[in-house]
Amino acid sequence: NNPTYRVTKESEVPGTIVYQMDDDDLSRILSNIRNARNLGDFVIAAAHIHQSRSILETQHLSTRPPEFYVDLAHQAIDAGADAFVGTGVQTLRGIEIYKGKPIFYGLGEFFREAQWELELMMGNADWSPDRRMQRFARNFGGNTQSLESLVAISHYKDGLLTEVRLYPTELGSDGPDSRLGIPRIAKPDDAQRILERVERLSDEWGTDIDIEGSVGIIRVN
């Protein structure tokens, strides 16, 4: 909460935000994961953050996880987690397979509550449908990227991850107001676009996503 600023070094990208986790917090998180490993058959670690990697990205719509979050995900797997799920951002992020374990840095929102009563209280009931959609998307830009998500299904054989199947969903961006926030399988063209975007976002970790129809498949060797 007390940021410091300095001139970027040669290897750094201007505008990059660097965070430092509290050592005690990190220690407790990893300790709890190790305890869960001893008590459970399958451990999923999750962390809710909004931080972005760059000042150029809005926090809730940051498509690239900051460095400390990637480090946390790796340490969570090393401590015994079978999977790591990032929450907090309202858009999609990339996917990494780390030591044979899936890391989902951001799958988007599975559903969203439409708080129309708040608009009525604030005197915004006369907004046009397009204006309500922009407000509902909460993306400060009017597009519907934050209304697109993924359902990920991981397949295992003999305890080892063999593949992850990705099913694109959307929250009623092109339907009536009554469907806003309700998840449904994305149409083929939308599914293709969503999967291609996630594929690009996953490039930095070398994750290959095969797109077969409206499904993305990550095959783990």
Spans of model-derived segments:
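Acidic, metal/ion-coordinating pockets
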Residues: 1-221
